Design a protein with these regions (language model features):
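Catalytic domains of riboflavin
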Residues: 1-250
Length: 250
C-alpha cells in the first residue's frame, strides 16, 4: 500500500481488538473505521486492484522444451511481490488462433510427479498436454498453488484425515481452510502477458471459467478433460462433483 501511494515501503501494524478481547473482524472493523474516520480496505480489494492495474508477474526466461508429447516452449515467470515462480508451456503459433486452447493447471506434486491414484491431477495434465500438442497450438499455465492453495504440508495432513474417513472438503475444513483457496489472477496475467485474450479452456471446473473472466479474459468455450475413475479416486471425484461443482462428463 505504501508503494502504491508513492511512499517509502514502510509502515506500522497493530491489531484492533473487539470488546471481548478477540481480534476485530468484518462488521466490527467497518464500524470502527466509521467511528474514527479511518480508511479501510479488504485484502481482496487490493488484490483485485493490483490484478487489473499492475502486473503481478514478470517473465524471467523462455526456453525450448522437448517432451514425450512434442516440442514446446517453456516460459518462466516470477511473482513481483512473493518471488514465487510459475510456468507457461506454449505450443505453436497460438496468437493466430481466434480462441487459444488453454489449460490453467495448479501444481499437484503427488499427482503430476509421482502419478498418485488418489486424484486425477496428473492424468488431467498429461491429457491437456497431449490435446494441445495434437492441436498444434495452445498454452498450459502451471501455477504453484499446491493442494488447492493450502500447500504441500497441509495437503498431506488432509490426506491423512481422508484415510480416517473424511472427504477432501471435510479434511480442508478440519484443518481450518476453505475447500478451495486457489487464485487465478496470476494465471490470467500470464495469459495476458503472452498476448492472449480469448480462450478455449480445458477444464471440468466452471468456477475456473468465472475466475478467468473476472480478470478480463473472454471464454469462448469449455472442453472437458475426461478421466476414467479408479478405485482409489472415485470417491474423491464424486466429492469434487457434488461439493465443488465440477462437471465430470462421461
Amino acid at each position: 500500500l505504501a508503494v502504491l501511494a508513492g511512499l517509502q515501503p514502510s509502515g506500522v501494524i497493530c491489531e484492533i481488538m473487539a470488546d471481548d478481547g478477540t481480534m476485530a473482524r468484518g462488521e466490527e472493523l467497518e464500524l470502527f473505521s466509521k467511528k474514527h474516520n479511518l480508511k479501510i480496505i479488504a485484502i481482496s480489494e487490493l488484490i483485485n486492484y493490483l490484478s487489473k492495474k499492475r502486473s503481478l508477474v514478470k517473465k524471467i526466461e523462455t526456453i525450448n522444451l522437448p517432451t514425450k508429447s512434442g516440442i514446446f516452449e517453456l516460459h518462466l515467470y516470477e511473482g513481483i511481490f512473493d518471488n514465487q515462480t510459475h510456468l507457461a508451456l506454449t505450443k505453436g503459433d497460438f496468437l493466430s488462433s481466434d480462441s487459444v486452447m488453454v489449460r490453467v493447471h495448479s501444481e499437484c506434486l503427488t499427482g503430476d510427479i509421482f502419478h498418485s491414484l488418489r486424484c486425477d491431477c496428473g492424468n488431467q495434465l498429461d491429457t491437456a498436454i497431449d490435446m494441445i500438442n495434437n492441436n498444434n497450438s495452445g498454452i498450459i499455465v502451471y501455477l504453484r498453488q499446491e493442494g488447492r492453495g493450502i500447500g504441500l504440508k497441509h495437503k498431506i495432513k488432509a490426506y491423512k484425515l481422508q484415510e480416517k474417513g473424511l472427504d477432501t472438503v471435510q479434511a480442508n475444513k478440519e484443518l481450518g481452510f476453505e475447500p478451495d483457496l486457489r487464485d487465478y489472477g496470476i494465471g490470467a496475467q500470464i495469459l495476458k502477458d503472452l498476448g492472449v485474450s480469448k480462450l478455449t479452456v480445458l477444464t471440468n471446473n466452471p468456477k475456473k471459467l468465472v475466475a478467468l473472466e473476472g480478470h478480463g479474459l473472454e471464454i469462448t468455450s469449455r472442453i472437458p478433460i475426461i478421466i476414467e475413475p479408479n478405485e482409489e479416486n472415485k470417491n474423491y471425484l464424486n466429492t469434487k462433483k457434488v461439493k465443488l461443482g465440477h462437471i465430470l462428463d462421461s
